[in-house]
Amino acid sequence: MPVSYEFIRTASWQPVSQDATVVAHYRALRFPEAWREAILALCNLGRPDGAEPYRTVPTYRFEQVIQAFAPDLLVLPRPSEHWLYVPEEVADPLPGPVLRSLVDRWLGDLRPEPEHRAFLKDVRAELSTSPPVWERVEAELLRCPTTLGGGTAAPFEHQFPLSPDWLARRVLALGPYEHAAGRLHFRAVPRGPRDKGAELVSQPLPFPSGTRTWWYSVVLNITLHTVPFDPLPRFHLHFGIRRWATRVSSTTGKVRLPYRRKATVVLRPRVPYLPGAPLSERYALARMERRWDREKEEWTTDWVNGGPASILRGISLAETLPGADEILSSPEEWLEQGLRAGIVYSTAMGGHEVKAGLMSHQRSKLTEWAEQALPAELRATPALVRTRRSKSSKPLNAPPASVKKEDKPEESARRAAERRAGAAYAVSCLTPDADPETLPTLEARLLWQTRELREAGVSQLVEHLGLKGDGGAFTEAQYEAARPGDPVVLEWQCAELTVRLRCIKLTAGLGEGLSLPPKGTRRTSSAISAAVHDRRTNARSWLAQDITDKAPTLAVVELDRRADFETGDHDPKFALRLGFADAGAITQFATVPKKDGRYDSLKNLDHRVSMAWDDGLRQLGIRVHPTHSLGDKIPAGLRYAAVWLVRKNRTARNRWAAYVPIAVLVTPQDFGSGIARVQGWDPEANKWIPYPALLLKLTRLAEVSVADADNGGRGSYYRDMNEQRRNTEEWLQKMLRSLRGTPTLLLAHGQNARSHWTWLQDGRVEADRIRDGHALARRLHPDLRLVRVRTGRDRETAQWWGLNPKEEANGLPSHLWVPESGGVSRVFYSTTPKPAQFKTSAIEADKLAPRPRRAGERKGETTIDTNIPGWNPGLVEIAVLGCHKNDGDDPESLALAVHQLRQPPDYPQALALPLPLHLAGLGQEYVLPTLAEEVEDEATAVADLHSIDASVVSAGDGDPDPAMAAGLFTEQDPEEDHESTRVDGLPEPTPPMPHDYGRIPNR
């Protein structure tokens, strides 16, 4: 029998009260103010006119050295009262002579040019007269103030690194974690000023599979967070799997590092690297990269910027840092020596037999063990209870969970009829001037390359919409001869609408790779921009011959997957999307069916093409909207608006930069019909326009000037941040004004929007108020409700599990969860089921030791789950920031309505975001390339799970954030790579890193 879960627990801790206090003792070092002007003068010496000057001292390289050679030191973001901390009981990791030598070498590394040696000598002499002094300081680790208007905990800046580190040290003091097959021995990993919280990593564990052994560790991250309107801060614990790269290429004899990616290396020296420094119990860190050597004009693999040892030239190290080639050539030997060196695996390095993630029950047991380290001043965060606002947490029009075999044809016909009704309504919205006596016409295009996909495309459209007949009989020669303006046209007549499909073979070289230098040759941003521009122009000219109607249309395009092109840069997908949009068509891509080694897209061709039609038609506004089950608990006629900010920095890895706010408005029509009007905000016309028209309009924002491609992105973006914020809030003012007159619930994604709409930050928000411009915060307009959604990105929501009432394995129930405490809450949590592909992932799965099978034909046999992905649905926080309780609004009911918006009836799986936010976010596909950036490595990834494998997960319009998929949070993209090319020994100035507490540190 299925377990009925009443409660869930989160892997989080909080103080027992606002008065709880813990004071820790440290030795701390201030960054000497007397040094600032001299070092800045050195850094800005000879900078070209117009270049962004340094306003804060670039200590990044110095901090890199500390992570490698003095890992016990905690580095805080500057400016802060103190820069470096070490617990009082830890031996001095940087004795005076060592520190002085490091500073001298660091200054020389900042400006190594011979012409600046005299100036460098003067700066060294000036700094030597005011050496930094270690101070004994006390630091409050728990108690913190609250925000004036919102009553939200506002931790001090030092608490974000120091408090998690204190808890991590307490967990280490517990000793090893005992499990059925052995013990886990954890060590701490150093954290820099951009890292969040503390991290513990276990010893490497072997996993024999086939003819080789794969290696992995268990990792624990502890981070400090806040929750809106809660005066108590929270500590989140995230347990996961870290995999080690040991596969050596048969061609090079080394581990493969993808170009333009950095790999983290964890180090454990046998003796201290620095003479006179103590041996730390912590691991050390350094980073490798594969980069283009401009002098040699070839790709090379080495430590980033020469590695931390390069800054110490002239200092005799007690043990030399291993060479990059040594580790890359014999990675397993270095692991087997007690993790003397381990390369953190990333998905770009190829496959790995150990799969990421831990399942719910094992997480709960690891958390239970860690809770033994809790001091009296902390407690586990209380359990959450399921909502009682509705009998079911599903929408009223949710499809049945299971359908009998004999009833499947009837259910399929019902759903097809829903889609046809939605299509008729969406098309009528696109053509408001059409004759109302004439049936609306849905016209789409199938741009095919292979006969197999063309035939599947036709048959799946027929099945998807429940069409009758074949639409017309044509020969293969007619299909081959079809061209833009003279296509093969298939047509079906239905009671609701006419469906017309124009089939055209993709020709003119549009499906080929972009015209770029070959693999192994450097490709500049200007060359790529020019190639994209050319293909975009050709695509527009080609398809425009077939489009005469001004209304947006849909094109399903058959194209090779990215891996089939020479490099990812050669993939023409983004250029085709832009060009076809210029011609008036929104696009959905389907990969060419083929079998290539382990890759086989032939076996699921029908399913993939069906999903392509599904996703493409949704872009036209054809969808079934979830109908809430709350009756009069929410306002009648409630609309749903959502904002999404497309913002991307131009970096070495991302060649496009963009900033544009997007708003979507979903207006349900007849209650229970599932039909809704979907519109987007046009800031130029200051009005709402059909959603597909918005998508087409967004492509203009993807224009990249070839002349500016190499020099127009990064510096100007950072200088314009304040202007972008002003523009965002002015845009918000106009958009929000248009929502008056009808009850509307406005949704925003916290991690996405708060950097530009700062009111969404925990440190600024106040209940039932809003600020969207220069004016002071004001009460919400009577028609507006404001809800902020937050996901597991940056570990901002905790890991979780259901509390099994039978004291059996803890599972993963889906529902809306509310705090147990009395009173009216404002913050709720949403969970959804695992996708169908992972229903067999056992909740009691064990990655460390064999366990008995619980069910199936092999029940009772032992198995181990190290090679099984640990898929867990993410925990979504729903914070009702603003409503009108005095007028009858119930925050819990509003939150349940948002929870139900994650479950559209026409999607195969639940969404990670509510539907309106999902639609707003998908607009970024028309502004930026949609390729999910590869994870650098699992040391910089910050979420629970591994990236979705496209060969496992069905096609579908995934959630807009590449870190999220349907109902799941996957292994996260790392933080934006701010490491830029070095000019004269200096990295470019880096921007501030926003976070959720109302304060933005200067870097």
Residue ranges and their predicted role:
Residues R294, W299, V304-H570:
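Long, charge-dense tracts
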Residues P2-E289, R294-G306, G314, V354, ...:
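Long, contiguous domain-sized segments
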